[in-house]
């Protein structure tokens, strides 16, 4: 059987240079077509998706402890805790370092702030307890950049309280207008914007997510649709021109994921998807990395806000945010997307088969 190892893989996403930006503003007056998260997929790369799902399902009856032992034996580099992440004390910090190094984010920030006084300001959205913020402060010294950060995460949720080690005076936790830190309330994002409107905010990182029950783990992508859109929208509101955005994703097979990735290619100068080495090859996690924020046209922002407040009215429904054909007809984008999806899915499927084989009695 072929084998695969944990390693960083990076993909560039582009739109066709000959295609005009989509007429997003024309969509505002149209009613949203919604589907349940179970039905929020189409036939796009269906074979790859279902093959991956079937392989995952073979693990349903496997003891979780035995699975972890087999997984960590095969892929020891990405183990949890201090064994695999001595410098940061967590794996998340290493994942952030790897995606930033693979795409040149630090060098971009250095160019953006060259000759300017003051700190580079970042926002950590849905970031509690602060692994990304902690890593940014640590890494910034290597690149001779001074940083200040603002954070928003859910309040009074176990495990999400901000690390006490985050530097006082350089990091400000915020919880929005209602004090909850919940980005599903657009007013909380607006409150964070009001705090940072005069700041040179050049980086937004977003690592939000939630535990998905094992029996519906295949639907993690669509179950996470609302929080993904909210973090993506927050970056559009908070970033200054030229800024960068890093967002944790899962699978990217659904129409919603395609639309967000496609729209990003018009909103930023350069768009990547990275599967970092410390993100286990056996899982679907990957990161959207956008460099060089270009600004959001007014009609686009109005529509995105409307979509967030009306289209994502609950956690069970996924809206169709733009016509599927607008994305599918762009041959350049679709070629890039298919290559990324196929590579990550095939590596993940093979890695899971390796774990299953190791679990078989000798």
UniProtKB/Swiss-Prot annotation:
Coiled-coil annotated residue ranges, if any: none
SUPFAM superfamilies from the UniProt entry: S-adenosyl-L-methionine-dependent methyltransferases
EC number from the UniProt entry: 2.1.1.57
Location of the RrmJ-type SAM-dependent 2'-O-MTase domain: 87-294
GO-annotated biological processes: 7-methylguanosine mRNA capping; methylation; mRNA modification; mRNA processing
Gene Ontology MF, one: mRNA (nucleoside-2'-O-)-methyltransferase activity
Keywords of this entry: Methyltransferase, mRNA capping, mRNA processing, Nucleus, S-adenosyl-L-methionine, Transferase
Protein name, as recorded: Cap-specific mRNA (nucleoside-2'-O-)-methyltransferase 1
Role this protein plays: S-adenosyl-L-methionine-dependent methyltransferase that mediates RNA cap1 2'-O-ribose methylation to the 5'-cap structure of spliced leader and U1 small nuclear RNAs. Methylates the ribose of the first nucleotide of a m(7)GpppG-capped RNA to produce m(7)GpppNmp (cap1). Cap1 modification is linked to higher levels of translation. Recognizes a guanosine cap on RNA independent of its N(7) methylation status.
Organism from which the protein derives: Trypanosoma cruzi (strain CL Brener)
Gene3D superfamilies: 3.40.50.12760
Signal sequence interval, chain numbering: none
Catalytic activity: a 5'-end (N(7)-methyl 5'-triphosphoguanosine)-ribonucleoside in mRNA + S-adenosyl-L-methionine = a 5'-end (N(7)-methyl 5'-triphosphoguanosine)-(2'-O-methyl-ribonucleoside) in mRNA + S-adenosyl-L-homocysteine + H(+)
Subcellular localization(s) per the UniProt record: Nucleus
Transmembrane segments: none
